[in-house]
Amino acid sequence: MSPEALQELIFTIANNLVSEGKAGTLTAEELPDSAKFAVMRPKDRAHGDWASNAAMQLAKKAGMKPRDLAQLFADALNGTDGIAAVEVAGPGFINITLDSASAAAVVDQVLDEGNRFGKNNHLSGKTLNLEFVSANPTGPIHIGGTRWAAVGDSMARILQANGATVVREYYFNDHGEQINRFAKSLVAAAHDEPTPVDGYKGAYIDEIARRVIVEANAEGIDILNLPRVDGGTDEKGEPLGEGDSEQREEFRKRAVPMMFDEIRQSMKEFRVHFDVWFHENSLYEDGEVEKAIADLRNAGDIYEKDGATWFESTEHGDDKDRVIIKSDGTYAYFAADIAYYRNKRHRKTDPADVAIYMLGADHHGYIGRMMAMCAAFGDKPGENMQILIGQMVNVMKDGKPVRMSKRAGNIVTIDDLIDAIGVDASRYSLARTDYNSPVDIDLNLLASHSNDNPVYYVQYAHARSCNVDRNAEAAQINAADADLSLLDTEADGEVIAALAQWPALLTLAGDLRAPHRIAHYLEDLAAAYHKWYNVERVVPMPLTEAEERADEQTRERTRIAKNPEPARAAARLKLNDAVQTVIAEGLDLLGVTAPDKM
């Protein structure tokens, strides 16, 4: 019997108590849905397999003492098939002990459903646009963006496992001053000149500059001798703006796509998939910025002041109004944000019911204006727009911070991390900590094959379970018709209970946008499995020389422990395979492989 089945049973009993007039002043309308009745695993096994606080939840509305109401629940639960014992404890907890067959039923459920176990339609009917990473195309993905890649892709997988339609989106900031600074840096590097004060530096700038020169020369363009003074036209024949030059424009139009390609390749190597690669520049080229401003103007949220155009965001909860067109006629950065949100909500293909933005800690000040813009379009902040803020990543090696990249100068990049510890360890370590908290990445630990390394610990549980399968096959153990009621030891119960908690945990991780909960669950399941593996045998094992020399009573006890009867071995093999299934599913949600050997 699963925790979800117990929730439904408790809900049914609550309804029956109300209809029979036994629940005091409680009415049917005041009952929460079944999912609101918490069923928890007690920390002390003496308190049963599962505990519920339903009586304490309802006692006030019922006008009853919690323990008295809890006793009514206990009386109704006693005698239910699959329940061995029920008792009331403490202020009104209902402690439930299952019989071994009922508890172990989840094992067959896992094996029947395979990697569908725990997946649900909780979020079906909703399209969630999940935008993450979205680093400027002016350099390699840095460690902060790498965290968002791991967290964002894992979150997308978890939301899909809960039935949502998820659009993974990357927003290329390819319009604005940062692109001009990138181009200026390339020109300076190409001429072996100092990096501009506001420019980008690092070996990658030299690499890109060389690639641009080679590409241009192959097309018969002597790019280094193009005019470097202001003036001229871009590739579309439009006049170049102030501070631009033909040479800088040639570097820009060639280098930005190169960075796009490099970013795409990095994401592919990191096992991160995007459905949409959206270019900021398209918002201007397609007139969407003007349309968005027009919509806000029609709604009365735009005014003119000091020669600039302002969004009256204070009317929607922001701390101050925001300029969207500067007095010189150029657009403020926020203008594109407005148009982009409007595009997400109203595009023809997969318009977003919920637009989720994953932003770095340096964007915390953007929340107010973004939510105000959402409200100005008639949407609900927090519902149609959700903003997640991630914290810093500190990379450590030999107990000291790693701050330098061979290629990118003063930042650590996604490629640096992959080279140091691989994709699996990188993704897992970045996803296992709540993105609201800073995270330390210990390169020494994550490269080690030890139980202190969390990704190794979980992957080793999967590999170990696969080895059990191989040994069981060699020993001709057949689990097809296993009697799961034989899974009656304390170690069996801990593993079974961990498996039973997976569906609720997966739902919670989706609701809370919390991939780290998946990682923590996997570590708990792996811990229960490793402990079980060390005390419960599946495949018969010969006694060691030391065990053979023990006294007769000890020797016989060890022989029995290491040579289970066939029926019990078959039941344990099923439990082993159920653990293997759930660990593989959980690792896949985090974008991490589940090896069969280590």
From Swiss-Prot:
Reaction catalyzed: tRNA(Arg) + L-arginine + ATP = L-arginyl-tRNA(Arg) + AMP + diphosphate
Ligase as UniProt keyword: yes
Keywords, in A-Z order: Aminoacyl-tRNA synthetase, ATP-binding, Cytoplasm, Ligase, Nucleotide-binding, Protein biosynthesis
Subunit and partners: Monomer.
Enzyme type, top EC level: ligase
GO biological process: arginyl-tRNA aminoacylation
HAMAP family listed in its UniProt record: Arg_tRNA_synth (MF_00123)
Family listed: Belongs to the class-I aminoacyl-tRNA synthetase family.
Gene Ontology MF term list: arginine-tRNA ligase activity; ATP binding
PANTHER family from the UniProt entry: ARGININE--TRNA LIGASE, CYTOPLASMIC (PTHR11956:SF5), ARGINYL-TRNA SYNTHETASE (PTHR11956)
EC number in record: 6.1.1.19
Region Disordered, annotated ranges: 229-248
Localization: Cytoplasm
TM annotation in the entry: none
Biased composition (Basic and acidic residues): 231-248
Motif 'HIGH' region boundaries: 135-145
Superkingdom, natural source: Bacteria
PROSITE patterns per record: AA_TRNA_LIGASE_I (PS00178)
Protein name, entry field: Arginine--tRNA ligase
Pfam families: Arg_tRNA_synt_N (PF03485), DALR_1 (PF05746), tRNA-synt_1d (PF00750)
Highest classification ranks of the organism: Bacteria, Bacillati, Actinomycetota, Actinomycetes, Bifidobacteriales
One Gene Ontology cellular component: cytoplasm
Organism, scientific name: Bifidobacterium animalis subsp. lactis (strain AD011)
InterPro entries reported in the protein's UniProt record: aa-tRNA-synth_I_CS, Arg-tRNA-ligase, Arg-tRNA-synth_N, Arg-tRNA-synth_N_sf, ArgRS_core, DALR_anticod-bd, Rossmann-like_a/b/a_fold, tRNAsynth_Ia_anticodon-bd
